[in-house]
Amino acid sequence: MSELCPCGSILNYHECCGPYILGTQVAAKPAILMRSRYCAYVEKNVDYLIATWHPDCHAQEWRESIIQGFTKTVWHGLTVIAETPGRHPDEAFVEFISRFTDADNAQITAMHERSRFLRIKEHWYYIDGIRPSLGRNDTCLCGSGKKHKKCCGR
């Protein structure tokens, strides 16, 4: 039986993010890398996450804290909003919303981020991201339909 990819595409995992995580394909675009990194979080694949962080981040130093985070987090979905070019051809941004629950809070929480990616020798790497601010009266990103201040913004 085939399994849909956790990244939210309508493709089978082995036709979508699986080849990137297995290392048989290289993500040609930052949004593809973003989706495959989300799948790596779902699958608890610390090696892929570390390999796709920009080398300047020294992500291998965070290995244990990444693994500890896996035990507390359950992922519920990813929405890629936009992929935009950066200031030069080897920089790009991906804006997304991911939904999750953690051990400390059973309510689904949404994380909104604009991630920055840099390309080195045809490989894209995640380097950092910013979280756009959300007004207290804006609709919460988690999909509850409630205002942010009455939901995840508490």
UniProtKB/Swiss-Prot annotation:
Top-level taxon of origin: Bacteria
SUPFAM superfamilies: NTF2-like (SSF54427), Sec-C motif (SSF103642)
Annotated Pfam families: SEC-C (PF02810), YchJ_M-like (PF17775)
InterPro entries: NTF2-like_dom_sf, SEC_C_motif, UPF0225, YchJ-like_M
Family matches, as HAMAP family: UPF0225 (MF_00612)
Family: Belongs to the UPF0225 family.
Name of the molecule in the record: UPF0225 protein YPTB2098
Organism phylogeny: Bacteria, Pseudomonadati, Pseudomonadota, Gammaproteobacteria, Enterobacterales
